[in-house]
Amino acid sequence: MGRFAAALVGSLFWLGLLLCGLGSLASAEPRAPPNRIAIVGAGIGGTSSAYYLRKKFGKDVKIDVFEREEVGGRLATLKVQGHDYEAGGSVIHPLNLHMKRFVKELGLSSVPASGGLVGVYNGKSLVFEESSWFVINVIKLVWRYGFQSLRMHMWVEDLLDKFMRIYRYQSHDYAFSSVEKLMHAIGGDDYVRLLNQTLRENLKKAGFSETFLNEMIAPVMKVNYGQSTDINAFVGAVSLTAADSNLWAVEGGNKIVCSGLLQASSSNLISGSVMSIEEKTRTKQTGNPTKMYEVVYKTGSETHSDFYDIVLVAAPLNRKMSNITFRNFDPPIEEFNDPYQQLVTTFIKGELNSTLFSSRPKDQFGLSAILVTDDSDMFINSLSIVASVRQKEGPPPAVDGMHVWKTFSRDILTKEQISKLFLSYDYAVRKPWLSYPHYEPPQKCPSIILHDRLYYLNGIEFAASCMEMSAIAGYNAALLAYHRWNGNEDMIDQDDLYERLKTEL
C-alpha cells in the first residue's frame, strides 16, 4: 500500500533511520522452561513471536500455533487468472529491520515494489502529477507548497529517529508491559501524546497549510489506512515513512515469511478456530497443583481442548474477527469493541479510462497510480498498476492497452463504477476485509498483559498497524513472557534505557 506514498513524496522525503543490530544477549539464569505455549493467530505477529519464543525458551518447549484461515493472516495474496497478487500488506521499508532479518535468515528473496508515476486527483482534475525527472518534481512541489515538504521530512525524521531506538532495546532483551510504556521509553511524554491528537491537529499547529494537508498528506493516509488526517499523529507519521524509493516485497508473497517463521521455530500448526480460553488448576506429575490455561478449539466439526503454561493471542479480539470467549477470569478480561476499518481490494484487468482524470490523450497519459483527496467524490481510495508476487521486473507491458490494476475502496465496487473507471475490462476479483483499526484519537491501546501468563499482541495496532509493528509486538511479547516466567523484572519497563545504552557500540 505504501508504494504510492513513495512515488508521491519521495522526491523530498529522505528518512534516515538508526540501524541497530539484533544479536542475542545473555540474561539472568532462567528456571525450567514451560512445557507448552499456545499462540492464537499465524500472521506476522504470531509467527514472529513463535520464532523468538523458540530462541528464548529453547528446543524442548512445545509451541502450538492456531490459525482458522491461512498462514499469513492479513498478509494475504489473491489469485487472479493463475497469478498471485498482494491483497494485504504489500511493501516493506528498506530499514524495517525485523522483516529484513527474517528474509535473510529464512533464505528468501526480495523484489522491488512496483514503480511508476503517481498523480493526485481531487474529483475534478489532477492537482499534482509526478515527473520522471527529480528536479522537475522538486520545482513543482516548491512552486505549489513552498518548503512544506522539506519541513514535513524533518518532522517525520525526528519522530522516526526516536522510534528506531526500539531495535536497540530489543537487541538487549528489554520488554514493555504496555504499548504506552513502550512509546514512552522511545520518546517520552511527547511521543505518547501523538496517540492523543489527530495528525491534522498536530500539523496545523506546526504551521502546515490546508492545501498541503489536503493534497499531499490526506491522499497518503487514504491509500495506506483508508482514513483521513483525523487519524492519530503517530500512525500518520508511520504512513509517511513509505516515502522511500527503495520499498520492496518478498518474492512469492510477503505471507511466506510467516510460513518460514513457523518452520524455523519448529512450531505445530493447528488449523482451527479457538473458541475459549480458561484458567484452570492442574496437578502435575510431581503432585503439585499449578495454574494452566485450557484452550478450547474447533477443527472442522470436532471440538478439542489442550492445556498450556503460556498463551499469546496474536489476532484482533474484536468480536467480528476472533470471537474468543475468556471464561471465569477474576477480574474479567476486558471487552474489545474497538472497530476495524473495512477495506475492499479489487484487482481489475482493463484499459483505464484516462479521460476521467485528464484531458490528455490516452497515449500520453503516463501515470501508473492515482491517489485521491478527501474532498473528492470518488468511490475509490486509490488505483495503481501492479505486478504479481513473482514478477521481479515489475508489471509487464500492456496488452491491448490493458494492465492489472489494484483499487482500494471502502465499499464493493459496482459494475457501473468499474465501467466508469475502465473503457473495457476482462475481469474484476475482489477481497473485502477488516484491514486495520479505525483510528480515532485520543487512542487507548488495549493491554498486552491480559492475565498472569496470557498476552495480547494486537493492541500495538492501535498505535500503528503495519508488518514491522506486528513483528516488534511479536518480539516484545516473547521477551515479556520469557522475563515474567523467569522473574527478570529488571528487564521490563525500564524508562532510562536510551541514556543507559546510547554510549554502547
UniProtKB/Swiss-Prot annotation:
<protein>
    <recommendedName>
        <fullName>Prenylcysteine oxidase 1</fullName>
        <ecNumber>1.8.3.5</ecNumber>
    </recommendedName>
</protein>
<keyword id="KW-0458">Lysosome</keyword>
<dbReference type="GO" id="GO:0102149">
    <property type="term" value="F:farnesylcysteine lyase activity"/>
</dbReference>
<dbReference type="GO" id="GO:0030327">
    <property type="term" value="P:prenylated protein catabolic process"/>
</dbReference>
<dbReference type="GO" id="GO:0030328">
    <property type="term" value="P:prenylcysteine catabolic process"/>
</dbReference>
<dbReference type="GO" id="GO:0005764">
    <property type="term" value="C:lysosome"/>
</dbReference>
<keyword id="KW-0560">Oxidoreductase</keyword>
<dbReference type="InterPro" id="IPR036188">
    <property type="entry name" value="FAD/NAD-bd_sf"/>
</dbReference>
<comment type="similarity">
    <text>Belongs to the prenylcysteine oxidase family.</text>
</comment>
<feature type="glycosylation site" description="N-linked (GlcNAc...) asparagine">
    <location>
        <position position="353"/>
    </location>
</feature>
<dbReference type="InterPro" id="IPR017046">
    <property type="entry name" value="Prenylcysteine_Oxase1"/>
</dbReference>
<dbReference type="Pfam" id="PF07156">
    <property type="entry name" value="Prenylcys_lyase"/>
</dbReference>
<keyword id="KW-0732">Signal</keyword>
<dbReference type="GO" id="GO:0034361">
    <property type="term" value="C:very-low-density lipoprotein particle"/>
</dbReference>
<feature type="glycosylation site" description="N-linked (GlcNAc...) asparagine">
    <location>
        <position position="323"/>
    </location>
</feature>
<dbReference type="Pfam" id="PF13450">
    <property type="entry name" value="NAD_binding_8"/>
</dbReference>
<dbReference type="GO" id="GO:0071949">
    <property type="term" value="F:FAD binding"/>
</dbReference>
<keyword id="KW-0274">FAD</keyword>
<keyword id="KW-0325">Glycoprotein</keyword>
<comment type="function">
    <text>Prenylcysteine oxidase that cleaves the thioether bond of prenyl-L-cysteines, such as farnesylcysteine and geranylgeranylcysteine. Only active against free prenylcysteines and not prenylcysteine residues within prenylated proteins or peptides. Involved in the final step in the degradation of prenylated proteins, by degrading prenylcysteines after the protein has been degraded.</text>
</comment>
<feature type="glycosylation site" description="N-linked (GlcNAc...) asparagine">
    <location>
        <position position="196"/>
    </location>
</feature>
<dbReference type="InterPro" id="IPR010795">
    <property type="entry name" value="Prenylcys_lyase"/>
</dbReference>
<keyword id="KW-0285">Flavoprotein</keyword>
<dbReference type="GO" id="GO:0001735">
    <property type="term" value="F:prenylcysteine oxidase activity"/>
</dbReference>
<feature type="signal peptide">
    <location>
        <begin position="1"/>
        <end position="28"/>
    </location>
</feature>
